Amino acid sequence: MDVTVKWMDGAMFVGESGSGHSLVMDGPEDLGGRNLGPRPMEMLLLGAGGCAMFDVVSMLKKARQKVHDCRVDIQAERADAIPAVFTTLNMHFVVSGKDLKESQVKRAVELSAEKYCSASIMFEAAGVAMSHSYAIEEFGED
């Protein structure tokens, strides 16, 4: 996997993925940025959330669950000293659908955390205290 990150000016960088996509990262104004994009550390959390969400939604669809919507809310704490690495991270999945089986949602979240989500597993291997939780919301008619 290859990516390129190019400095634009101030604290703004443009990342280009090997799959041909670009994104802007920027810092806050007090650090020379213009706040035009997420911070690089936020990008790490967004990537982990996307990775885990891909797994969970895919597994629920394979289990023929009627998923209408899904999101993951991530709360992370960072060390006070530099390097300000992540120390704790919780992924809370909120899955809405019709007649969802809790056992299927629980299994999807657990399998993502323990086996499939490379990003989450990498955080855990680096010493981040990881936790995962979920909530199920019933959604009306199909």
Locate the predicted segments by residue.
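Extended beta-strand/beta-hairpin segments
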Residues: 1-46, 57-142
